[in-house]
C-alpha cells in the first residue's frame, strides 16, 4: 500500500538502484528545459505586443503553474531520487505535496478555461467578450489558484513520502474518500470537459465550413460575374482585436454590413480569424435571403482578402491549445490507470516510478509546443534569445 509513517522518508529499494539515475537524468532535463522555456514564455508574453492580449493571460497562468513545478519542486524530486531519501524534513514534505497538487489543479482549471474560450469564440462569439472581459479573466485566474490551494489544503496532515514513487504526496488510505472525489473532479471530470469542448469546436468548424461552401455555391449560381466577390460577401467573420474589446468599439469595416461580425481575441493577438467560424444557420439564412441584386452590388470589405489566412490562424491556434491539453492528458493517463488497476501495488516499483516520472513531462513540454506550432511565439523566443538583455527595454 501507499502508506508510511511521517517519520519514514526513505524510498530505498534494491530494484530501483539502477533506475534512479535514469530518473535523475530525466528530472534534470525537465527542470532545466521547463525553467528556461517557461521563463522565455513569460518574457514573450510581456515583450511581444501582439501577444499582449487578455486571453493570453490564460497562457501566462498555465506557464506560472509549470514554472512553479519545474523551478521550485522538480529539484527536490531529483534530489530525492538521487539519494532515495527525502532530506528536507516533514514540514517541507507537506509544503511540497500541497504545491504539487495545487499546480496540477491550476493547470487543469486553466486548460478548461482555454477550451471554454475557444468554444465560445466560435459558437457564441457575442458571449465571448462578456465572459472574458478584463474583470472576468482576472477573476477566473485568481480563482484557479484559490480553488487549487483550497481543495488540497485539508490534506495537510497526511502529506507523506510515498516510497513507491519516491515523492511527497497524500496518504491514499487516510485521505479517502476526499482524495478519491478530488481526483475524480480534476482528472476525470475536468479533463473530460476539455476534450468535449474540443470535440464541439471540431463539429462547429466542420458545419461552418459546409455552410460556407453552400453559400459560395449559391452566390456563384446567382450571378456568375461575381464569383470573385463571394469571399468578400461572406456572412460573417471574426476579427480578434484586443484593443477594440477593451474599448468596446466596433470592428473596422463591419458596422455597415448586413451581417455583424463578432469581435473577439485570441492567442494570436491582432490576427483575424475568419471563414470556418461562421455559424451554419446564419450562413444558410444569408444564402436564402440574398437577392441577385444584393450580390451584384456587393462591395469589397476591407481585410476580407485575408479571410483564408485568418481562418487558418484560428485552426493553428486551436490545434496548439488542443496539443497542450493532449500532452497533459497523455502524461497522466498511464499514472492514473496504474493507480486504479494496481491499487495494491503488485506491479514492480520501477513501473510505478516510470509512470510517475512521465507526469513530469507536462511541466516542460508547453514552451516546445508554442515554438513548434505558433509563429508569433517562435519569433518572440528568437528575438529574446538574440537580443538578450536588450529585450527588456521593450518593457519600459
Swiss-Prot record:
Regions that span the bilayer: 27-47, 58-78, 95-115, 145-165, 181-201, 321-341, 353-373
Membrane-side (Extracellular) residue stretches: 1-26, 79-94, 166-180, 342-352
Principal location class: membrane
Positions of modified residues (Phosphoserine): 221, 224
Keyword Transmembrane helix in record: yes
Tissue-wise expression: Expressed predominantly in hematopoietic tissues. High levels detected in the bone marrow and lower levels in the peripheral leukocytes and lung. Also expressed in brain, heart, muscle, colon, thymus, spleen, kidney, liver, placenta and intestine. Within the leukocyte population expression is higher in neutrophils and eosinophils relative to T- or B-lymphocytes.
Cytoplasmic topological domain: 48-57, 116-144, 202-320, 374-396
Keywords from the named record: Cell membrane, G-protein coupled receptor, Glycoprotein, Membrane, Phosphoprotein, Receptor, Transducer, Transmembrane, Transmembrane helix
Cellular component terms per the entry's GO annotation: plasma membrane; receptor complex; specific granule membrane; tertiary granule membrane
Modified residues (Phosphothreonine): 263-264
Membrane topology: Multi-pass membrane protein
Superkingdom in the source lineage: Eukaryota
Biased segments, Low complexity type: 247-260
Post-translation changes: Phosphorylated by a subset of GPR84-activating ligands. Constitutively phosphorylated at Ser-221 and Ser-224 in the absence of 2-HTP. By contrast, Thr-263 and Thr-264 are phosphorylated only following prior cell treatment with 2-HTP.
Matching Pfam families: 7tm_1
Entry-listed glycosylation sites: 3, 8
UniProt GO BP: neuropeptide signaling pathway
Protein family: Belongs to the G-protein coupled receptor 1 family.
Function comment: G protein-coupled receptor that responds endogenously to dietary fatty acids or nutrient, specifically medium-chain free fatty acid (FFA) with carbon chain lengths of C9 to C14. Capric acid (C10:0), undecanoic acid (C11:0) and lauric acid (C12:0) are the most potent agonists. In immune cells, functions as a pro-inflammatory receptor via 6-OAU and promotes the expression of pro-inflammatory mediators such as TNFalpha, IL-6 and IL-12B as well as stimulating chemotactic responses through activation of signaling mediators AKT, ERK and NF-kappa-B.
Name of the featured protein: G-protein coupled receptor 84
Organism: Homo sapiens (Human)
Origin organism lineage: Eukaryota, Metazoa, Chordata, Craniata, Vertebrata
Amino acid at each position: 500500500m501507499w502508506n508510511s509513517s511521517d517519520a519514514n522518508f526513505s524510498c530505498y529499494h534494491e530494484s530501483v538502484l539502477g533506475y534512479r539515475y535514469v530518473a535523475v537524468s530525466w528530472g534534470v532535463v525537465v527542470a532545466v528545459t521547463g525553467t528556461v522555456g517557461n521563463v522565455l514564455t513569460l518574457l514573450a508574453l510581456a515583450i511581444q505586443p501582439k501577444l499582449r492580449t487578455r486571453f493570453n493571460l490564460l497562457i501566462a497562468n498555465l506557464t506560472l503553474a509549470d514554472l512553479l513545478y519545474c523551478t521550485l519542486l522538480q529539484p527536490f524530486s531529483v534530489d530525492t531520487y538521487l539519494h532515495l531519501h527525502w532530506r528536507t524534513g516533514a514540514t517541507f514534505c507537506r509544503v511540497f505535496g500541497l504545491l504539487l497538487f495545487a499546480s496540477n489543479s491550476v493547470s487543469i482549471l486553466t486548460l478548461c478555461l482555454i477550451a471554454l474560450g475557444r468554444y465560445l469564440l466560435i459558437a457564441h462569439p457575442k458571449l465571448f467578450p462578456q465572459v472574458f472581459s478584463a474583470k472576468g479573466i482576472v477573476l477566473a485566474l485568481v480563482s484557479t489558484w484559490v480553488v487549487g490551494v483550497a481543495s488540497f489544503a485539508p490534506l495537510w496532515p497526511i502529506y507523506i513520502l510515498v516510497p513507491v514513487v519516491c515523492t511527497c504526496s497524500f496518504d491514499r488510505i487516510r485521505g479517502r474518500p476526499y482524495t478519491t472525489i478530488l481526483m475524480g473532479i480534476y482528472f476525470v471530470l475536468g479533463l473530460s470537459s476539455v476534450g468535449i469542448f474540443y470535440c464541439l469546436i471540431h463539429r462547429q468548424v466542420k458545419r461552418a465550413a459546409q455552410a460556407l461552401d453552400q453559400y459560395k455555391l449559391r452566390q456563384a449560381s446567382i450571378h456568375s460575374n461575381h464569383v470573385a466577390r463571394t469571399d468578400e460577401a461572406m456572412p460573417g467573420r471574426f476579427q480578434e482585436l484586443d484593443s477594440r474589446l477593451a474599448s468596446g468599439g466596433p470592428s473596422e469595416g463591419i458596422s455597415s454590413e448586413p451581417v455583424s461580425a463578432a469581435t473577439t481575441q485570441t492567442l494570436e493577438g491582432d490576427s483575424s480569424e475568419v471563414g470556418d467560424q461562421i455559424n451554419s444557420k446564419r450562413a444558410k439564412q444569408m444564402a436564402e435571403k440574398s437577392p441577385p441584386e444584393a450580390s451584384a452590388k456587393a462591395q469589397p470589405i476591407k481585410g476580407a482578402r485575408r479571410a483564408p489566412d485568418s481562418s487558418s490562424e484560428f485552426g493553428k491556434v486551436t490545434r496548439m491549445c488542443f496539443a497542450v491539453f493532449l500532452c497533459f492528458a497523455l502524461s497522466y493517463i498511464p499514472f492514473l490507470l496504474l493507480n486504479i488497476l494496481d491499487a495494491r501495488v503488485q506491479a514492480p516499483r520501477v513501473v510505478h516510478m516510470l509512470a510517475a516520472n512521465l507526469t513530469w513531462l507536462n511541466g516542460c513540454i508547453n514552451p516546445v509546443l508554442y515554438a513548434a506550432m505558433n509563429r508569433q511565439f517562435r519569433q518572440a523566443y528568437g528575438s529574446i534569445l538574440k537580443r538578450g538583455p536588450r529585450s527588456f527595454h521593450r518593457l519600459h
